[in-house]
Amino acid sequence: SYQLNLADTRMKLKLPDGAIEMKLRVLGKHNVYNALAAAAASTAIGISKENIASGLELFGGVDGRLQQKKCQHGATMIDDSYNANPESVRAALSVLASTLGEKILILGDMGELGDNAVDFHECIGEEARLIGIDRLFALGKLSAYSVKKFGAGAQHFKNIEDLITEVESALAPNVTLLIKGSRFMQMDRIVRKFEMEASDI
C-alpha cells in the first residue's frame, strides 16, 4: 500500500521476510512502481527488508526529475525540466494535480515526436485542463497547440523573458509550479531563475 503527497511518498511493502514501512523522497505514482521493481529485484538476490527500505529511503531522485523546490513568495516549484515526452508529462501532471492550491504548468515543446507532434501537444493541453490544472504558461512553437486546447487560463510566450515576468507575477504561497519541457528548450533556465530568487525567502 502507499500514500502520495507533495512532501513524500509513504509505502508499506510486504516481502517474504515480513512487512516494512518506508518513506520515499521521490514524487509520483510511477516512482512507487519503480520502488516496487527495485524491491522485488533486491529480494530475489537475498537483500534484507531493512536494507531494501534503507536504500529506497536514501534515494533522492535525479536533478531535473520531479524535484520539489521552494521559490520566491512562498510558492512551490516541481522541477521536471530535464526532458519531456508525452508519458513523462502525464506522470508529472498527475503529481501537480495532487497538490493543493493553484496549479500552474510551465510547458516547453516536446521534441522528437515526428508526424504526431501537433496531436501530442494538443492532447497534453486538453489533459492538463481535464485533471484540474489552473493555468498553463507555454514556450515554443508546438506548445502553442497545447495552449489552444487548454483554453481559458493558458498563455503562449514567444520568449523566455516574457514568460518569466508572467510567472513571477503569479507566485504566491498557495501556488505550485511544474516546469517541464524537452532538453532543447532549456527549461532549466526558468528553474535557475527561481532558485536564485529563493535565496531571498
Language model: regions and residue ranges:
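A short, compositionally biased
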Residues: Q3-R10
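ATP-dependent carboxylate-amine ligase
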Residues: A7, D17, E21-H30, L36-I201
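A generic structural motif
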Residues: K12-K14
